[in-house]
Design a protein with these regions (language model features):
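N-terminal Rossmann-like dinucleotide-binding module
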Residues: 1-44
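C-terminal helix-rich "cap/oligomerization" subdomain common to oxidoreductases
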Residues: 5, 24, 63-66, 101, ...
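Active-site loop of classical SDR/Rossmann-like NAD(P)-dependent oxidoreductases
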Residues: 32, 284-298, 313
Protein backbone atom coordinates (compact mmCIF):
# COMPACT_ATOMS: atom_id res chain seq x y z
CA UNK A 1 0.00 0.00 0.00
CA UNK A 2 1.10 3.57 -0.60
CA UNK A 3 1.13 6.22 2.13
CA UNK A 4 1.78 9.87 1.39
CA UNK A 5 3.67 12.06 3.86
CA UNK A 6 2.61 15.71 3.81
CA UNK A 7 5.22 17.93 5.45
CA UNK A 8 8.95 17.63 4.85
CA UNK A 9 10.27 19.50 7.88
CA UNK A 10 12.32 18.20 10.79
CA UNK A 11 9.76 15.53 11.70
CA UNK A 12 9.80 13.99 8.20
CA UNK A 13 12.83 11.79 8.86
CA UNK A 14 11.20 9.91 11.74
CA UNK A 15 7.95 9.50 9.81
CA UNK A 16 9.79 8.07 6.82
CA UNK A 17 11.79 5.74 9.07
CA UNK A 18 8.63 4.55 10.81
CA UNK A 19 6.88 3.81 7.53
CA UNK A 20 10.05 2.28 6.11
CA UNK A 21 9.86 -0.57 8.63
CA UNK A 22 6.67 -1.81 7.00
CA UNK A 23 7.67 -4.09 4.12
CA UNK A 24 4.49 -3.59 2.11
CA UNK A 25 4.41 0.21 2.45
CA UNK A 26 5.53 2.52 -0.34
CA UNK A 27 6.07 6.13 0.76
CA UNK A 28 5.68 9.34 -1.23
CA UNK A 29 6.32 12.86 0.12
CA UNK A 30 4.80 16.29 -0.41
CA UNK A 31 5.51 19.84 0.77
CA UNK A 32 4.43 23.20 -0.61
CA UNK A 33 8.09 24.21 -0.25
CA UNK A 34 9.55 22.76 -3.44
CA UNK A 35 13.11 22.71 -2.13
CA UNK A 36 12.11 20.79 0.99
CA UNK A 37 10.04 18.27 -0.94
CA UNK A 38 12.80 17.70 -3.48
CA UNK A 39 15.51 17.40 -0.82
CA UNK A 40 13.61 14.77 1.19
CA UNK A 41 12.53 12.91 -1.94
CA UNK A 42 16.07 12.74 -3.29
CA UNK A 43 17.57 11.96 0.12
CA UNK A 44 15.38 8.87 0.59
CA UNK A 45 14.80 8.08 -3.10
CA UNK A 46 11.06 8.67 -2.80
CA UNK A 47 8.58 10.19 -5.25
CA UNK A 48 7.89 13.79 -4.26
CA UNK A 49 5.46 16.59 -5.04
CA UNK A 50 4.91 20.24 -4.15
CA UNK A 51 1.23 20.16 -5.19
CA UNK A 52 -1.01 19.11 -2.28
CA UNK A 53 -4.18 19.02 -4.40
CA UNK A 54 -2.64 16.65 -6.92
CA UNK A 55 -1.08 14.61 -4.14
CA UNK A 56 -4.42 14.06 -2.39
CA UNK A 57 -6.11 13.29 -5.71
CA UNK A 58 -3.69 10.41 -6.34
CA UNK A 59 -5.86 7.27 -6.40
CA UNK A 60 -2.84 5.11 -5.57
CA UNK A 61 -2.57 6.67 -2.10
CA UNK A 62 -4.31 4.57 0.54
CA UNK A 63 -3.54 6.94 3.41
CA UNK A 64 -1.76 10.18 4.25
CA UNK A 65 0.56 11.07 7.11
CA UNK A 66 0.31 14.75 8.07
CA UNK A 67 3.41 16.22 9.72
CA UNK A 68 2.86 19.95 9.34
CA UNK A 69 2.38 22.83 11.83
CA UNK A 70 -0.80 22.61 13.92
CA UNK A 71 -2.38 25.61 12.19
CA UNK A 72 -2.59 23.60 8.93
CA UNK A 73 -3.99 20.37 10.37
CA UNK A 74 -7.73 21.02 10.08
CA UNK A 75 -7.61 21.92 6.40
CA UNK A 76 -5.27 19.09 5.39
CA UNK A 77 -7.04 16.43 7.44
CA UNK A 78 -10.47 17.44 6.15
CA UNK A 79 -9.22 17.43 2.56
CA UNK A 80 -7.80 13.96 3.11
CA UNK A 81 -11.12 12.78 4.55
CA UNK A 82 -13.04 14.28 1.63
CA UNK A 83 -10.68 12.42 -0.71
CA UNK A 84 -11.47 9.18 1.10
CA UNK A 85 -7.97 8.72 2.55
CA UNK A 86 -7.19 7.19 5.92
CA UNK A 87 -4.95 9.57 7.88
CA UNK A 88 -2.35 9.82 10.59
CA UNK A 89 -1.83 13.34 11.94
CA UNK A 90 0.69 14.77 14.37
CA UNK A 91 -0.84 16.03 17.61
CA UNK A 92 -2.99 17.90 18.33
CA UNK A 93 -5.68 17.07 15.79
CA UNK A 94 -6.39 20.73 15.08
CA UNK A 95 -6.82 24.14 16.67
CA UNK A 96 -10.59 24.52 17.11
CA UNK A 97 -13.19 22.20 18.61
CA UNK A 98 -15.66 22.75 15.75
CA UNK A 99 -13.07 21.55 13.23
CA UNK A 100 -12.37 18.44 15.29
CA UNK A 101 -16.08 17.57 15.38
CA UNK A 102 -16.36 18.10 11.63
CA UNK A 103 -13.37 15.81 11.08
CA UNK A 104 -14.81 13.18 13.39
CA UNK A 105 -18.14 13.23 11.55
CA UNK A 106 -16.34 12.82 8.22
CA UNK A 107 -14.29 9.89 9.48
CA UNK A 108 -17.40 8.11 10.76
CA UNK A 109 -19.44 8.84 7.63
CA UNK A 110 -16.76 7.44 5.32
CA UNK A 111 -15.64 4.60 7.64
CA UNK A 112 -12.06 5.86 7.63
CA UNK A 113 -9.20 5.30 10.03
CA UNK A 114 -8.03 8.55 11.60
CA UNK A 115 -5.22 8.45 14.15
CA UNK A 116 -3.53 11.33 15.97
CA UNK A 117 0.05 10.99 17.19
CA UNK A 118 -0.36 10.55 20.93
CA UNK A 119 2.66 8.29 21.04
CA UNK A 120 2.82 7.77 24.81
CA UNK A 121 -0.05 5.29 24.58
CA UNK A 122 2.43 2.94 22.90
CA UNK A 123 4.89 2.92 25.79
CA UNK A 124 4.85 -0.45 27.62
CA UNK A 125 5.25 1.26 30.98
CA UNK A 126 2.17 3.41 30.37
CA UNK A 127 0.26 0.37 29.16
CA UNK A 128 0.83 -0.99 32.69
CA UNK A 129 -0.59 2.22 34.16
CA UNK A 130 -3.63 1.98 31.89
CA UNK A 131 -4.28 -1.60 32.98
CA UNK A 132 -3.99 -0.63 36.64
CA UNK A 133 -6.42 2.26 36.21
CA UNK A 134 -9.13 -0.23 35.31
CA UNK A 135 -11.11 2.15 33.10
CA UNK A 136 -11.98 -0.69 30.71
CA UNK A 137 -12.46 -3.34 33.44
CA UNK A 138 -13.27 -1.56 36.76
CA UNK A 139 -13.61 -4.87 38.62
CA UNK A 140 -10.05 -5.86 37.70
CA UNK A 141 -8.12 -3.22 39.63
CA UNK A 142 -5.38 -5.02 41.60
CA UNK A 143 -4.52 -1.84 43.53
CA UNK A 144 -8.08 -0.66 43.97
CA UNK A 145 -9.55 2.59 42.66
CA UNK A 146 -7.31 5.55 41.75
CA UNK A 147 -7.21 8.25 44.42
CA UNK A 148 -4.94 10.95 42.95
CA UNK A 149 -2.70 11.41 39.92
CA UNK A 150 -0.04 13.78 38.64
CA UNK A 151 1.55 14.02 35.21
CA UNK A 152 4.62 16.02 34.22
CA UNK A 153 6.41 16.69 30.95
CA UNK A 154 9.06 19.34 30.32
CA UNK A 155 11.51 20.13 27.56
CA UNK A 156 13.66 23.01 26.43
CA UNK A 157 11.83 23.94 23.24
CA UNK A 158 13.83 26.18 20.88
CA UNK A 159 13.44 23.83 17.88
CA UNK A 160 11.26 25.97 15.62
CA UNK A 161 9.87 29.50 15.99
CA UNK A 162 6.27 28.52 15.18
CA UNK A 163 6.22 26.22 18.22
CA UNK A 164 6.56 29.33 20.44
CA UNK A 165 4.04 31.62 18.70
CA UNK A 166 0.35 31.93 19.56
CA UNK A 167 -0.66 32.67 15.98
CA UNK A 168 0.64 29.27 14.86
CA UNK A 169 -0.86 27.37 17.82
CA UNK A 170 2.47 26.92 19.54
CA UNK A 171 3.14 26.83 23.26
CA UNK A 172 3.47 24.35 26.11
CA UNK A 173 -0.19 23.35 25.97
CA UNK A 174 -0.25 22.24 22.33
CA UNK A 175 3.32 20.99 22.19
CA UNK A 176 3.65 19.23 25.55
CA UNK A 177 0.59 19.13 27.79
CA UNK A 178 -1.61 17.42 25.18
CA UNK A 179 0.49 14.25 25.49
CA UNK A 180 -0.13 13.96 29.23
CA UNK A 181 -3.75 15.05 28.89
CA UNK A 182 -4.31 12.26 26.39
CA UNK A 183 -2.76 9.74 28.79
CA UNK A 184 -4.97 10.99 31.63
CA UNK A 185 -8.07 10.57 29.45
CA UNK A 186 -6.90 7.08 28.43
CA UNK A 187 -6.48 6.18 32.09
CA UNK A 188 -9.49 7.87 33.68
CA UNK A 189 -12.01 8.84 31.00
CA UNK A 190 -13.26 12.24 29.78
CA UNK A 191 -12.54 15.53 31.54
CA UNK A 192 -15.45 17.09 33.44
CA UNK A 193 -13.88 20.43 34.40
CA UNK A 194 -10.56 22.29 34.35
CA UNK A 195 -8.88 24.78 36.68
CA UNK A 196 -5.77 26.57 35.44
CA UNK A 197 -3.34 27.02 38.32
CA UNK A 198 -0.61 28.77 36.33
CA UNK A 199 -0.11 29.64 32.67
CA UNK A 200 2.97 31.78 32.06
CA UNK A 201 5.49 32.96 29.51
CA UNK A 202 8.78 32.69 31.40
CA UNK A 203 11.19 33.03 28.47
CA UNK A 204 9.91 35.62 25.97
CA UNK A 205 13.30 35.75 24.26
CA UNK A 206 14.44 32.55 22.55
CA UNK A 207 17.53 31.56 20.60
CA UNK A 208 16.33 29.45 17.68
CA UNK A 209 18.37 28.37 14.65
CA UNK A 210 21.12 30.81 15.59
CA UNK A 211 18.82 33.83 15.91
CA UNK A 212 17.34 35.60 18.95
CA UNK A 213 13.56 35.86 18.53
CA UNK A 214 10.70 37.28 20.58
CA UNK A 215 7.91 34.79 21.26
CA UNK A 216 4.48 35.06 22.87
CA UNK A 217 3.10 31.56 23.52
CA UNK A 218 2.98 30.17 27.06
CA UNK A 219 5.97 28.04 28.04
CA UNK A 220 4.81 26.91 31.50
CA UNK A 221 1.39 25.57 32.47
CA UNK A 222 -0.05 23.81 35.50
CA UNK A 223 -3.70 22.75 35.57
CA UNK A 224 -6.06 20.63 37.63
CA UNK A 225 -8.44 18.39 35.70
CA UNK A 226 -11.50 16.79 37.23
CA UNK A 227 -12.23 13.57 35.38
CA UNK A 228 -15.70 12.18 34.70
CA UNK A 229 -15.47 9.88 37.72
CA UNK A 230 -14.48 12.74 40.02
CA UNK A 231 -10.74 11.99 40.21
CA UNK A 232 -8.53 15.09 40.49
CA UNK A 233 -5.52 15.05 38.14
CA UNK A 234 -2.66 17.57 38.10
CA UNK A 235 -0.78 18.09 34.85
CA UNK A 236 2.32 20.28 34.56
CA UNK A 237 3.98 20.93 31.21
CA UNK A 238 6.63 23.35 30.04
CA UNK A 239 9.17 24.40 27.43
CA UNK A 240 11.72 25.67 29.96
CA UNK A 241 13.30 22.39 31.17
CA UNK A 242 16.87 22.14 29.78
CA UNK A 243 16.97 18.32 29.98
CA UNK A 244 13.75 16.56 28.95
CA UNK A 245 11.79 15.30 31.96
CA UNK A 246 8.63 13.19 32.01
CA UNK A 247 6.76 11.02 34.50
CA UNK A 248 3.33 9.85 35.63
CA UNK A 249 2.40 9.07 39.24
CA UNK A 250 -0.92 7.54 40.29
CA UNK A 251 -1.95 6.75 43.85
CA UNK A 252 -4.46 3.93 44.33
CA UNK A 253 -6.31 2.64 47.39
CA UNK A 254 -3.75 -0.13 47.87
CA UNK A 255 -0.64 1.01 46.07
CA UNK A 256 1.07 3.31 43.60
CA UNK A 257 2.16 3.43 39.98
CA UNK A 258 5.20 5.43 38.89
CA UNK A 259 6.14 5.49 35.22
CA UNK A 260 8.35 7.32 32.74
CA UNK A 261 9.61 6.78 29.21
CA UNK A 262 13.06 7.71 30.54
CA UNK A 263 15.16 4.76 31.63
CA UNK A 264 16.96 6.85 34.26
CA UNK A 265 13.65 7.58 36.03
CA UNK A 266 12.19 5.02 38.46
CA UNK A 267 9.24 3.09 37.03
CA UNK A 268 7.49 0.67 39.35
CA UNK A 269 4.30 -0.67 40.87
CA UNK A 270 4.05 -0.58 44.66
CA UNK A 271 1.40 -2.73 46.32
CA UNK A 272 0.51 -2.71 50.01
CA UNK A 273 -0.50 -6.36 49.70
CA UNK A 274 -0.06 -9.17 47.17
CA UNK A 275 -2.53 -8.71 44.30
CA UNK A 276 -2.67 -10.56 40.98
CA UNK A 277 0.82 -10.51 39.45
CA UNK A 278 2.15 -7.98 41.96
CA UNK A 279 3.67 -9.15 45.25
CA UNK A 280 3.57 -6.98 48.33
CA UNK A 281 6.08 -4.15 48.04
CA UNK A 282 7.78 -2.63 45.00
CA UNK A 283 7.89 -4.27 41.56
CA UNK A 284 10.34 -2.50 39.20
CA UNK A 285 9.18 -1.97 35.61
CA UNK A 286 11.99 -2.31 33.08
CA UNK A 287 11.35 -2.37 29.36
CA UNK A 288 14.60 -0.99 27.95
CA UNK A 289 14.72 1.42 25.03
CA UNK A 290 11.73 1.12 22.70
CA UNK A 291 11.00 3.23 19.63
CA UNK A 292 7.48 4.37 20.45
CA UNK A 293 6.99 6.12 17.14
CA UNK A 294 7.74 2.92 15.22
CA UNK A 295 5.27 1.01 17.39
CA UNK A 296 2.65 3.66 16.72
CA UNK A 297 3.19 3.70 12.96
CA UNK A 298 3.15 -0.11 12.85
CA UNK A 299 -0.25 -0.05 14.57
CA UNK A 300 -1.59 2.55 12.13
CA UNK A 301 -0.36 0.57 9.11
CA UNK A 302 -1.82 -2.66 10.48
CA UNK A 303 -5.26 -1.11 10.87
CA UNK A 304 -5.16 0.49 7.43
CA UNK A 305 -3.84 -2.71 5.85
CA UNK A 306 -6.63 -4.80 7.34
CA UNK A 307 -9.30 -2.08 7.21
CA UNK A 308 -9.71 -2.67 10.93
CA UNK A 309 -11.23 -0.02 13.26
CA UNK A 310 -8.86 1.46 15.81
CA UNK A 311 -9.05 0.36 19.42
CA UNK A 312 -6.43 2.83 20.68
CA UNK A 313 -5.91 6.45 19.59
CA UNK A 314 -9.34 6.60 18.00
CA UNK A 315 -10.79 9.75 16.51
CA UNK A 316 -13.18 9.91 19.48
CA UNK A 317 -10.17 9.83 21.83
CA UNK A 318 -8.74 12.84 20.00
CA UNK A 319 -12.08 14.63 20.20
CA UNK A 320 -12.07 14.19 23.99
CA UNK A 321 -8.63 15.79 24.14
CA UNK A 322 -9.89 18.70 22.04
CA UNK A 323 -12.91 19.14 24.33
CA UNK A 324 -10.60 19.29 27.36
CA UNK A 325 -8.35 21.82 25.60
CA UNK A 326 -11.41 23.96 24.88
CA UNK A 327 -12.26 23.99 28.60
CA UNK A 328 -8.66 24.87 29.42
CA UNK A 329 -8.53 27.79 27.01
CA UNK A 330 -11.80 29.22 28.27
CA UNK A 331 -10.25 29.79 31.71
Amino acid sequence: MKIGLIGCGKQAWKHIAGLGNEEDVETAVCDINTDRARAIGEKFDLPWSDDVDAFLADDTLTAVNIATPTLTHADLVMRAVEAGKHFFCEKPLCRHIDDSRRIRDGVVEKSLIGMVGYVYRYSPVFEVGHALSGLDVPNARPLGAPVAASFRIGGRGDHEVWKHRQESSGGAISEMMVHMLDLAIWYFGPVRSVQVVSCELLRPLRHIAGVDVRVDAEDFVLARFEMAGGLQVLIQADLVTPAFSQFVEVQFERGSFMGSIQNDYPSYVFSTEAADMYPEGKTPLRFGTINLFERQMAAFCEHVRNDKPLERNTIDDSLRVMEALEMLRQQ
